[in-house]
Regions:
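Residue-level preference for nonpolar/small residues embedded in alpha-helices
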Residues: 14-15, 79, 105
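Amphipathic alpha-helical segments
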Residues: 15-29, 87-91
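Mid-chain, well-packed structural core segment of small domains
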Residues: 64-85
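N-terminal beta-strand motif that seeds the catalytic metal site of vicinal oxygen chelate
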Residues: 1-19, 69, 75, 122-125
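Vicinal oxygen chelate
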Residues: 3, 7, 32-33, 40-43, ...
Length: 125
C-alpha cells in the first residue's frame, strides 16, 4: 500500500484572501475555517476525493528565498491564453524564473507571491 497526497498546507499572511483566490482558480469551495484562522478549500464533493485539499495557514514568519515547491495547474475548459487572462484578472501576476519564452507553460504568482505554473491542457475536465 502507498500513500497519496490528501492536503497541501500553505503558510501565508492572509488565509482568507488566498483561499478566495485559489477557490476561483480551481473552482473549489471553502470546506472549513479553524479557530486560528486557517482556511481549508477543496473540491465541491469535499475531502477525500482525487484532488487534495489546500489549507491556508496563518503565519507571520518572514519568507526567505524561493519556495522549494510550487503548484502546476492545467486548463480544463478553455484554451491556455483565455485561462491566462482569467488568472491575471483574478490577481495573479507574471513571475520571472528565467524563462526563455519558448516554454509551453506560464509562470505566475498568486496575490502573496507564491509561484505556480499554468500548463497547457493535459488532463480531462
Amino acid at each position: 500500500m502507498a500513500c497519496r497526497i490528501s492536503e497541501l498546507v500553505i503558510d501565508c499572511r492572509d488565509p482568507r484572501r488566498l483561499a478566495a483566490f485559489w477557490c476561483q482558480v480551481l473552482d473549489f469551495v471553502v470546506l472549513g475555517t479553524e479557530d486560528d484562522g486557517a482556511v481549508e478549500i477543496g473540491p465541491r464533493e469535499g475531502f477525500g476525493g482525487l484532488q487534495p485539499t489546500l489549507v491556508f495557514s496563518p503565519s507571520t514568519e518572514p519568507r526567505s528565498g524561493k519556495l522549494p515547491l510550487h503548484i502546476d495547474v492545467n486548463v480544463t475548459d478553455r484554451d491556455q491564453d483565455a485561462e491566462l487572462e482569467r488568472l491575471l484578472a483574478l490577481g495573479a501576476r507574471p513571475a520571472d524564473v528565467g524563462q526563455t519564452g519558448e516554454e509551453s507553460w506560464h509562470c505566475l504568482a498568486d496575490p502573496e507571491g507564491n509561484e505556480f505554473c499554468l500548463l497547457r491542457a493535459r488532463l480531462p475536465a
